[in-house]
Each structure stands twice: as C-alpha cells, then as structure tokens.
C-alpha cells in the first residue's frame, strides 16, 4: 500500500479466506500498556474493570549526549511540508482513544495516504507526550521496505497530524483470525520479513517494543509493513519503561529489570508461535496471570509444531538472556541462520523479489478500502487556530 507503488498482479488467497478489518489506528483488540515519566506505577486493567498496580520503576534510558546528537542528526524534518489544505479527507480507517486515522488524498499528486490525528489534550492527559514525540522522531529516521513511511507532520491548536503511507491490504491480525492459524511456510515468510525489519531497527539502536500481528499491515502485493511506532525508542544501552502488549511482553520487562533489544526477539518468538498456533503461549484473560505465566510457566508446543520451529522458539522465548537468539554476539545472524529459515533467500526477500503467499483481494487499486471495516463518520473540527496551551510539548510537529 505504499504511496509510491503501482497496482498490479493477480489475486491470491490463503485458505480461501481474505484479510480485512481496520487500518491500524492507535488501539487494537489487545490493548497496549505503558508507563512514562511522571507515571511510573502502572495500573493494569483486569477482567471486569478491576485494576492492580504494577511495581514502581525508574523511567531511565542510558546513553550519552553525544550518542543522542548523532542519532537525531539522521532525522528528516517533518514539519512545514504539508498543511490540512493539501489533502481531501475521504473516510475513517480506524479509531482509538487519542483520535482517529483517515484515508486522505493529496490535492497535488492525487495519491492516497493515511492521516493519523491525535488530540493533544488527550495525549497529555494520558501521559503519552514522550511516546508521541518518540514516534515522530523514529519515523523521521527509518527508511525500510518493511516499515511504514511517514511523509510529514503538522498541527493546529488542538490536534497533531501525521501523514503516512496508506497500506491497502489490512492487518496481518485480521488475516490470521480468518485463517485461524498459518501453515508453516506462510508463517515463515511473514516472520522472515519481520526479522529483516527488526535487524534494521536494531542497527540504528531503535527497539520497537510492541511487536504483534495488529501492528503489521499487508501491502497490495502481500508484503508486510510494520506500523505504529508509539513505543519505539532509541536505546543504545538499556531502559526500564514498562510498555507493550501483555501477551508479548518479555519477562525482563514484567520484572522491571533493565532491558535492551532482547525484548524484541522475545516478542518475535511469540509472534511466530501465534501465527503457527493461532494463540499466544502465555495467554490468560487475567492480565496479572498472563504476567505470572510469562515469568514462570513452561513453554509448551502444540503437537503439529515441527522440530525446527520448536528449537527456534525455545531459543527465542527463553528467560535466559545469555541464550536468547538475537541477543548474542552474532545478533540477528543467529536468527537468520537457524535451520527453520534455511529456505529463505534473504537478499531476494529484502528486495521484495519473491512471491508472497497471499495477495489481498484489492479490486480498485490505490485508495481501495475493501479490506477495512467501516466506521461512523463524525463532524471533525480540524485546523483550529487560537491559543495552544500545549505548543511547547509538540514543537517538532
């Protein structure tokens, strides 16, 4: 669904079931959790609305000032390129607690984009200012075939606007739910593309921190695009912040220990497990029990998992950081060289010169919304001028 790609190619199906549902917005079926500076203890919602407190933890990321200067020097300027008048708002693609995502069309080049709109007052009230600014920064730095592209940002007195690629094929999550589970070659294909995206992010000292099927979109050809960088962060050494989606959170995060890129490889293992099994290994309807299982439960496999994938997952979903693949001396190479990935030609995959296992049934080319749910449209009040009490908090937008 990249705004730079041309439509084409025949339609393929996976188990004769087709992916649909909403363009990725700010929230999804499995809610994320986060702490931020000034909000160090986290209330974790339980079934029935009860809450339990997670332990307080420091909000610290270790790096020196010179390192950070070199990192942000890579960033593209995102503000000043566009304004609301440059686009026609067509329909809502997704909604969330911070705002909504719209399908828009440029009045200049006719291309379709996704516009993520966040309400400043809500972002501030929910203490997500740092994560919102980090999302803009990370997306202004990354450029990769399997990662969403942000084209620019702007703001008014009440909202923040982020202009992104529009990805027509929908969420991997939707396809997985319709398919119940993926055959081994299909899961391997998506996992390999995710692996390359993680390798790229980690090469820039960015940890993603919220890997799950809901945050993976499929373009018109069936290749992935990782989206939603709200929890991504520059971490050259270690950090402490509790964030992520409970089923996917690594044990070192749950136990409030310092962590680094290792947490993405744990989540990568959970992703592979869910794609193959149709469920996550430590799921419980009670979030606190999920955390307990992550810390203590034995990793069990369905009988149809083959030996190679069981070996890979046992090396990814391990609490021993000295044994977790991706976190060892050879980094991502240890993951890519595992026998489960032996058929993957990584160079061809990176160049997208490989047939995908599923091609979304897009009929009308760019701007097609057939893979997304419909949302009730609301009267919008964008472009508000006047006093902005939060101007200093979002100055880079």
Swiss-Prot record:
CDD domains to which the protein is assigned, alphabetical: STKc_PKA_like
Coiled-coil annotated spans: none
Activity-regulation annotation: Activated by cAMP.
UniProt-annotated stretches for the region Disordered: 1-60
Protein's name in the database: cAMP-dependent protein kinase type 1
Entry's EC annotation: 2.7.11.11
Organism: Saccharomyces cerevisiae (strain ATCC 204508 / S288c)
Encoding gene (name): TPK1
Cell compartment(s), UniProt: Cytoplasm; Nucleus
SUPFAM superfamilies in alphabetical order: Protein kinase-like (PK-like)
Modified residues (N-acetylserine): 2
Domain AGC-kinase C-terminal, residue spans: 342-397
Gene Ontology biological-process annotations: cell division; double-strand break repair via nonhomologous end joining; negative regulation of cytoplasmic mRNA processing body assembly; protein import into nucleus; protein kinase A signaling; Ras protein signal transduction; regulation of macroautophagy; signal transduction
């Amino acid at each position: 669904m990249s705004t730079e790609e041309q439509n084409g190619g025949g339609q393929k199906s996976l188990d004769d079931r087709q992916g649909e549902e909403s363009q990725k917005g700010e929230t999804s079926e499995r809610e994320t959790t986060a702490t931020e500076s000034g909000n160090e203890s986290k209330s974790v919602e339980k079934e029935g609305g009860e809450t339990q407190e997670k332990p307080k933890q420091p909000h610290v990321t270790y790096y020196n000032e010179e390192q950070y200067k070199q990192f942000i020097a890579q960033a593209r300027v995102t503000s000043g390129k566009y304004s609301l008048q440059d686009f026609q708002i067509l329909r809502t693609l997704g909604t969330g607690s911070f705002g909504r995502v719209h399908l828009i069309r440029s009045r200049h080049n006719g291309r379709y984009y996704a516009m993520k709109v966040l309400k400043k007052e809500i972002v501030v009230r929910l203490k997500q200012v740092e994560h919102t600014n980090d999302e803009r920064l990370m997306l202004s730095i990354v450029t990769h075939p399997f990662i969403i592209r942000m084209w620019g940002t702007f703001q008014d007195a009440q909202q923040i606007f982020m202009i992104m690629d529009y990805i027509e094929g929908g969420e991997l999550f939707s396809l997985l739910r319709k398919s119940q589970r993926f055959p081994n070659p299909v899961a391997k294909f998506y996992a390999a593309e995710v692996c390359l995206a993680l390798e790229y992010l980690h090469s820039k000292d960015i940890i993603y921190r919220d890997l799950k099927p809901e945050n993976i979109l499929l373009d018109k050809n069936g290749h992935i695009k990782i989206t939603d960088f709200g929890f991504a962060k520059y971490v050259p050494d270690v950090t402490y912040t509790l964030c992520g989606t409970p089923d996917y959170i690594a044990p070192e995060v749950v136990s409030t220990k310092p962590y680094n890129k290792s947490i993405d490889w744990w989540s990568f293992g959970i992703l592979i497990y869910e794609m193959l099994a149709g469920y996550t290994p430590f799921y419980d309807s009670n979030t606190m029990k999920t955390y307990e299982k992550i810390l203590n439960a034995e990793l069990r496999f369905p009988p149809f998992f083959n030996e190679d994938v069981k070996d890979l997952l046992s090396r990814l979903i391990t609490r021993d950081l000295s044994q977790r693949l991706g976190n060892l001396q050879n980094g991502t190479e240890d993951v890519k060289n595992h026998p489960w990935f032996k058929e993957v030609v990584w160079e061809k995959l990176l160049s997208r010169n490989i047939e995908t296992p599923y091609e979304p049934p897009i009929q009308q080319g760019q701007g097609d919304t057939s893979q997304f749910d419909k949302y009730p449209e609301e009267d919008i009040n964008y472009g508000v001028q006047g006093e902005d009490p939060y101007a200093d908090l979002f100055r880079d937008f």
